Structures are given as C-alpha cells and as structure tokens.
Design a protein with these regions (language model features):
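The feature marks helicase ATPase cores and/or their adjacent C-terminal helical subdomains
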Residues: 1-175
Length: 175
C-alpha cells in the first residue's frame, strides 16, 4: 500500500522537490502524495555568514563533499555544535569527561574507567582547576571551541541542532 501522506516532508519542501522532479522526462508515474501540514522553509543562501544559526534546527546540504569542506570550519569559528557523517563536532567523550571531572572535583565517585579516561586528559590532578585549565592534554583550539559553544548556549548533552551533509548522504534525514 503506497503512502498517501508524509509525516516528515513539509509543504514548501515538497513543492520545491516537485518542481525539480517534474523536469525528469523518464517514464515517471504521477502519484498523489500529500505533505505534512507544517509549511517548512527553504533558504537558498550563498554565504553562511548571512544566516543566523544560533537557534533552531538546521540541515545544511551541498551537492558534493568538496563543497561541504569549508562548512565545518566556519561552524566551529562561530561556536556552533553540529554533526557530519563522521559524527558530532566535539567527538564522543570530551563533554562526558568534563562532566565526570566536575563530579570528581566535588568528591563524587565515578566509574574507574571514566576516571582513568579523565586523568589521561591532564598532566596532574588538581581539583581546584576548571576543566579547561586541568585538561592540558586537550588542544587549546578544541577547548576554545567547546567554551565558545557553551557560551552560545549549545546543549552538548543532546544531539547537535545542525546537520551538515551531501544531498545524497541526507536521504531520509531531516533537520
């Protein structure tokens, strides 16, 4: 049974997709397929700096990987949390280790494996130090990026709000 109504595709996005697919001359069968009620929005911009991505969910698409290449660098310079096909922009464990370090500083007991991982990020343990001073085995650029994201109000305990992908790689994805 073919699907009659989308639960993901907003009307503006479907309209644009239909304008593109209507140019395909192959033997396509016409289908009745209704978008979800939400309108959605398509922003076609040629400069990332013209877009305020500090709020909301974003899906940044480009046709090829070479076109995507400068985007993560820009997002990092703006202190924005994002994900690519390679994962999120800070890696899996650094934010967790900061949380564990804060617990260790308060005298809370944490699992031994996590404690060892935290201690590997520093030369010597000093509970008086904030994570960004204590973690001297973490690159300064990474610490600056993390502090910038936190200052921007990014919630690093959740999935990133911004996804960066090729059009092909995003098939089925949504912002």
């Amino acid at each position: 049974i073919p699907l009659q109504q989308s639960e993901r595709v907003p009307s503006e996005i479907q309209l644009k997709a239909l304008q593109i697919i209507d140019r395909v001359q192959d033997n396509r069968l016409s289908k009745d397929y209704l978008p979800k009620k939400e309108a959605g929005e398509i922003l076609m911009q040629f400069k990332l700096s013209a877009i305020d991505m500090t709020k909301g969910d974003w899906l940044i698409l480009a046709r090829t990987n070479p076109l995507l290449k400068p985007i993560p660098k820009y997002l990092k310079s703006m202190g924005l949390f994002f994900e690519t096909a390679q994962g999120n922009s800070i890696g899996k464990t650094l934010f967790e280790d900061i949380d564990y370090w804060n617990k260790m500083r308060k005298g809370e007991k944490i699992p031994e494996v996590q404690e060892q991982r935290v201690l590997e990020r520093m030369s010597k343990r000093d509970n008086k130090l904030e994570w960004y001073d204590a973690f001297d085995h973490v690159a300064l650029s990474k610490k600056d990026y993390l502090r910038s994201m936190l200052a921007n109000g990014e919630d690093l305990s959740k999935k990133p709000r911004i996804k960066v992908s090729t059009i092909h790689g995003a098939k089925g994805g949504e912002a």
